[in-house]
């Protein structure tokens, strides 16, 4: 207890010295932004910040995340390759420029340039963009894209006039959108400050100034909560829930998260992972029930699959390979590895709930079945760059897809990496299964909902049967709200902090 108190005192001293009176609402989150360019990163952390400064053509408001109008008042799929969006009139960017179809066309054309965008998956699906008038946009896609509209809440629209001649360095100082909040200041490692857009098309938000403080260290987030240095804190440490519940000034809010935590793998020829028996053995070696009980303190739900129930492609009845160390040893021996082999368990140490501890546990389980396991955990800023460079054979990572469609996830996570086509962008182990690739490509053109669900469920089943990955659990999102300001906060399924929704 004394050590905890000392740690909290140190953490309090580390908090930014910003007076709460200067800001109407302070939110502490567990991840910083990497850029103010809304297309530079597709991580939920970066998109969360961007959702305050920018709007998409559509939105997914809390609590249910149902696709709804935003900068587009209506939309329709005209045929298999054509989508029409009818834009909202009277909307202005923060600099006073009028929003119109030219901005939409410019945005999606800019997203095709890898210099500015990592959203190539959607951008490269577009063959052409027509703007017959200022408030109509017609997209022609290269092939049928069933989930095209489903992603339009996270493809944020930028102001053409102020963006076209600026690089990312300049853009980071003054992002220009139509969102509910105007950008004020980004002090890296400390805070992002924003001011209410009084002319917002949905009406001015409640809080006039908002500050989002990224704090990756659990103890420091807890200290902010204990010291009333924040109004809302996300990423509440599960190990400290009992202590937080005893704080009279704090209300805990939790909800099942859509994010699945899983172990990604390689199956490269010449490596042990190329043998499915090795992949099965590793799955049998991991005691997920113990991870949930002892590491997650019950704040997680075991899963056999990565997509969650609301996602098209989720399949009832899929079962994970049971924890069975003896079967694991037997499979390793059959594969020619009775004496084990060296294996590195990689992962971030500041991205997911107890990520480092989970990696440590997995390494321990693998050692128990005879593998020579070592740990390689590091800050997410380094780890994800390594994932993008396909440097790891076995790693912990998390995922959920805002499109609610396994097809898009499969293209990014399971398809053999093909950077030119935007395939396998987050397939960190470069897992490759030609049959799975074929199924993914074929499913991408299926528009009928029932037929598409059947095809995506087949992809899901194969990924589990071939042990393309080892799903562990769905996280539980836990937020803390400090009482006193009558803050009404409803967590979103995507974990975004959308300040306009806080009442």
Go through the PLM ranges and name each one.
Residues 5, 76, 120-162:
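Surface-exposed binding/hinge segments that line
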Residues 23-26, 45, 187, 261, ...:
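Detector for C-terminal structural segments
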Residues 28-79, 109, 176-178:
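N-terminal lobe/hinge region of extracytoplasmic solute-binding protein
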Residues 61-66, 153-205, 209, 326, ...:
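Gly/Pro-rich hinge or "lid" segments in bacterial periplasmic/extracellular proteins
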Residues 73-116, 132, 138, 221-224, ...:
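Aromatic- and charge-enriched surface segment that lines or borders ligand/interaction sites
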Residues 197-243, 372:
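Ligand-site clamp/hinge motif
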Residues 269, 302-334, 352-357:
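Structural transition elements
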């Amino acid at each position: 207890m004394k050590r905890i108190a000392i740690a909290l005192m140190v953490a309090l001293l580390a908090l930014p010295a910003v007076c709460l009176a200067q800001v109407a609402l302070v939110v502490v989150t567990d991840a910083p932004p990497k850029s103010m360019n809304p297309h530079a990163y597709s991580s939920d952390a970066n998109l969360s910040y961007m959702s305050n400064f920018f709007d998409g053509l559509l939105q997914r408001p809390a609590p249910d995340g149902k696709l709804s109008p935003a900068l587009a008042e209506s939309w329709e799929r005209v045929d298999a390759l054509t989508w029409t969006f009818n834009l909202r009139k009277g909307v202005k960017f923060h600099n006073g420029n009028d929003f119109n179809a030219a901005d939409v066309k410019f945005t999606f054309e800019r997203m095709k340039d890898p210099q500015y965008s990592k959203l190539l998956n959607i951008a490269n699906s577009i063959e052409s963009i027509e703007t017959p008038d200022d408030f109509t946009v017609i997209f022609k896609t290269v092939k049928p894209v069933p989930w095209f509209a489903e992603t339009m809440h996270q493809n944020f629209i930028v102001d053409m006039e102020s963006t076209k001649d600026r690089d990312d360095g300049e853009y980071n100082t003054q992002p220009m959108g139509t969102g509910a909040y105007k950008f004020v200041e980004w002090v890296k490692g400390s805070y992002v400050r924003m001011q209410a857009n009084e002319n917002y098309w949905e009406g001015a938000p409640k809080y006039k100034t908002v500050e989002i403080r990224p704090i990756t260290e659990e103890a420091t987030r807890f200290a902010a909560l204990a010291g009333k240095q924040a109004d809302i804190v996300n990423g509440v440490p599960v190990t400290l829930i009992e202590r937080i519940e005893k704080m009279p000034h704090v209300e805990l809010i939790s909800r099942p998260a859509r994010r699945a935590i899983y172990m990604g793998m390689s199956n490269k020829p010449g490596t042990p992972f190329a043998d499915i028996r090795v992949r099965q053995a590793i799955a049998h070696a991991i005691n997920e029930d113990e991870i949930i009980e002892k590491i997650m303190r019950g704040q997680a739900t075991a899963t056999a699959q990565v997509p969650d129930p609301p996602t098209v492609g989720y399949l009832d009845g899929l079962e994970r390979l049971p924890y069975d160390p003896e079967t694991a040893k037997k499979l390793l021996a059959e594969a020619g590895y009775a004496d084990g082999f060296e294996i590195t368990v990689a992962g971030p140490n500041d991205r997911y709930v107890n990520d480092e501890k989970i990696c440590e546990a997995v390494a321990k389980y693998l050692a128990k079945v005879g593998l020579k396991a070592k740990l390689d955990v590091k800050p997410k800023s380094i780890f994800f760059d390594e994932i993008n460079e396909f440097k790891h054979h076995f790693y912990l990572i998390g995922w959920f897809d805002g499109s609610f469609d396994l097809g898009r996830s499969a293209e990014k996570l399971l398809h053999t990496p093909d950077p030119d086509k935007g395939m396998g962008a987050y397939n960190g182990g470069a897992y490759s299964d030609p049959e799975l690739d074929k199924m993914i490509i074929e499913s991408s053109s299926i528009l009928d909902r029932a037929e598409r669900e059947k095809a995506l469920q087949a992809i899901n089943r194969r990924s589990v049967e071939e042990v393309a990955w080892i799903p562990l659990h769905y996280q539980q999102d836990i937020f803390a709200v400090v009482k006193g300001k009558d803050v009404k906060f409803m967590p979103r399924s995507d974990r975004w902090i959308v300040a306009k929704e806080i009442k």
